[in-house]
C-alpha cells in the first residue's frame, strides 16, 4: 500500500495539515490503474485469481500461494505482458516436496514419458531444494526445451527450473547419418530390441557428422560393437565413445 506522509505545523495555537500534492494523487491513480490491469490479466487464468497484487510506480508485487511452479511462472509471464510494468517482485509460495528423492523420480518419469525424447537426444540433470537443473542436447525439429520445461514445471514440489538445453543445428547430413546408424545398429541382436528409439539406456548425439555415444550398455561387447557400427557408417567423421557399462 502507498502511504502518504502527514505533516502537522504548529502556528500560535492552530495546527494545519499539509494537503496531498497533485503529484501524489496522480501517482496513486496510476498505481490503481496498473493494479487493475494486472488483475484483469491474471483473472484470465482461474488458478491465478487468488493472488494479491500491489503496485508502486512500475513495480508490481505478487503475493500468495500457487500449486505448482508452472502456475507461478505463468503469473510472472502474464504480469510482465501488461503495459507499464517495469519490474515484478514475486512473493509467491509453491508447496515443497515431502521427499526430494521422490521428486527426482517424478522428474525422470516426466522426461521418459515425453514422446519426443529419443535416442538422438541426451539430457542430464540434478535437483537440490526443489530446483531442477537440466542440460544436454536435443534434435531441432521442435522446441523440446520449452515442452520439457512445461512438463517439469507442472510437477508438484518443483520450486524452479534451470534449463541449459541446446537445440542441435538443423543439418540434412546429420539426419542422413542418424538413419544410416539406426539401420546398422538395429540389425544387431544386442540392440534390435531398442528399435523404437524410445527410452533407450544409450544415446547417440550427431552434430556436424561427429557422433558422441552416451549413456549405458550391458557390457564391453555392446560398447565396442556400437562404436564399430557407428565408426563404419559412411559420412561419420569421428566417434567419441563415452558409453558406460552396467557390468
Residue ranges and their predicted role:
Residues 2-247:
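N-terminal targeting leaders
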Amino acid at each position: 500500500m502507498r502511504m502518504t506522509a502527514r505533516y502537522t505545523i504548529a502556528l500560535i495555537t492552530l495546527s494545519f495539515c499539509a494537503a496531498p500534492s497533485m503529484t501524489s494523487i496522480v501517482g496513486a491513480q496510476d498505481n490503481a490503474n496498473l493494479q487493475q490491469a494486472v488483475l484483469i490479466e491474471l483473472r484470465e487464468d482461474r488458478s491465478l485469481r487468488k493472488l494479491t497484487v500491489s503496485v508502486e510506480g512500475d513495480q508490481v508485487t505478487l503475493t500468495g500461494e500457487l500449486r505448482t511452479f508452472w502456475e507461478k511462472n505463468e503469473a510472472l509471464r502474464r504480469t510482465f505482458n501488461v503495459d507499464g510494468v517495469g519490474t515484478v517482485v514475486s512473493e509467491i509460495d509453491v508447496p515443497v516436496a515431502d521427499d526430494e528423492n521422490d521428486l527426482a523420480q517424478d522428474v525422470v518419469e516426466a522426461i521418459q514419458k515425453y514422446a519426443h525424447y529419443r535416442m538422438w537426444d541426451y539430457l542430464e540433470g540434478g535437483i537440490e531444494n526443489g530446483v531442477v537443473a537440466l542440460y544436454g542436447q536435443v534434435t531441432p525439429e521442435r522446441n523440446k526445451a520449452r515442452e520439457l520445461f512445461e512438463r517439469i514445471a507442472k510437477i508438484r514440489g518443483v520450486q524452479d527450473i534451470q534449463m541449459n538445453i541446446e537445440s542441435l543445428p538443423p543439418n540434412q547430413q546429420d539426419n542422413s547419418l542418424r538413419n544410416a546408424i539406426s539401420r546398422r545398429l538395429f540389425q544387431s541382436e544386442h540392440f534390435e530390441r531398442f528399435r523404437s528409439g524410445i527410452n533407450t539406456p544409450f544415446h547417440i548425439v550427431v552434430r556436424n557428422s561427429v557422433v558422441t555415444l552416451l549413456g549405458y550398455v550391458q557390457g564391453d561387447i555392446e560398447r565396442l560393437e556400437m562404436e564399430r557400427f557407428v565408426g563404419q557408417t559412411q559420412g561419420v567423421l569421428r566417434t567419441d565413445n563415452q558409453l558406460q557399462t552396467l557390468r
